[in-house]
């Protein structure tokens, strides 16, 4: 019944185009993946930036509803950019032809703040599941990123709906023999997740929603303390490992490290100094991440990977550092391996 209901609502999903169907829907991403965020709210081409930067895998941010109360997903909440092969489809096909792939990301700070994150916006669990399935089948993707922060961390009804929808999608995927993975991207402190972040994961366990990766955003701490960003990343990840041990006591430490993702904000983050992630930090984190065997290494955002605004904090288009174009991408990209 769950599968049938979910598939019925998912009828809005158009059949895959020949270009989409050429990609094996069961193909697994590399076990250890560098996948920087691409700002889909810009006019940039994912394919072009992937080619220029050398970033073969991109996380496309963000998908949200046009208004609170809606159950319709669009890119950036804009009806002019629907979930359809006509939006990003050709780019995705070219990225795949070059040996890469994409991960669509739902939510993000703006959507989580204004109630347009799909599970906060939509009151129907089957409709939320159908939205996830629509993205999966339209773009033939095997992983979805759920960026859950701000008000989405305290909206208990939305948390419950989201995790119930994840479980529905996983049941559907098993029924139709599709590989589907879910990533929760959540903020962290140096001392680990806030209780709200832990609650999101506890609720997932309650509803038997399999979360494949917990991706922590190791930036924007806003605590007015001095920070050594690479060291703080390692510390926060160690605390996350402890949380995962509590949630999944039968899993080994190796398996739990492979549930962890890290997202840095390269250069000067939104808070500004002293939260500056340097090129040296990137080298240290990439080496540490390979050593620990984490699943994902990402950064916000590909469009920021240039030295166009030295000293500027929190820009969407440059890192605030003196650097060469795509320098962080070059440091992080070797992390991708099986």
Question: Which positions does each model-derived feature cover?
Answer:
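Secretory targeting and sorting signals
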Residues: 1-22
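Chitinase-like catalytic core of GlcNAc-active glycosidases
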Residues: 22-216, 220-247, 251, 255-261, ...
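Beta-sheet entry/capping signal
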Residues: 101, 296-298
């Amino acid at each position: 019944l769950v599968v049938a209901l979910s598939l019925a609502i998912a009828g809005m999903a158009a059949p895959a185009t020949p270009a989409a169907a050429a990609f094996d829907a069961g193909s697994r991403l590399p076990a250890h993946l560098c996948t920087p965020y691409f700002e889909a709210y810009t006019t940039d081409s994912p394919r072009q930036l992937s080619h220029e930067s050398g970033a073969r895998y991109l996380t496309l941010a963000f998908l949200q509803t046009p208004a609170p109360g809606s159950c319709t997903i669009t890119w950036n909440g804009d009806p002019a950019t629907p979930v359809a092969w006509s939006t990003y489809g050709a780019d995705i096909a070219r990225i795949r032809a070059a040996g890469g792939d994409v991960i669509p990301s739902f939510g993000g700070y703006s959507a989580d703040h204004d109630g347009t994150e799909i599970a906060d916006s939509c009151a129907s669990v089957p409709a939320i599941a159908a939205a996830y399935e629509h993205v999966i089948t339209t773009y033939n993707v095997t992983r979805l990123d759920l960026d859950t922060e701000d008000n989405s961390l305290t909206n208990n009804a939305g948390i419950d709906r989201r995790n119930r929808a994840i479980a529905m999608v996983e049941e559907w995927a098993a029924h139709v023999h599709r590989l589907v993975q879910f990533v929760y991207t959540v903020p962290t402190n140096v001392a680990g997740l806030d209780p709200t972040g832990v609650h999101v994961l506890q609720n997932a366990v309650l509803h038997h929603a399999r979360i494949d990766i917990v991706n922590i955003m190791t930036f924007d701490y806003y605590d007015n303390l001095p920070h050594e960003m690479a060291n703080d990343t390692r510390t926060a990840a160690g605390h996350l490992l402890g949380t995962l041990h509590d949630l999944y006591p039968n899993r080994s430490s190796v398996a739990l490290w492979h549930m962890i993702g890290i997202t840095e904000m390269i250069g000067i983050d939104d808070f500004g100094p002293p939260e500056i992630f340097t090129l040296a930090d990137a080298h240290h984190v990439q080496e540490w991440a390979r050593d620990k065997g984490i699943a994902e290494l990402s950064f916000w955002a590909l469009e920021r990977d240039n030295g166009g605004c030295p000293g500027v904090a929190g820009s969407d288009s440059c890192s605030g550092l003196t650097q060469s174009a795509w320098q962080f991408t070059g440091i992080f990209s070797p992390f991708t391996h099986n």
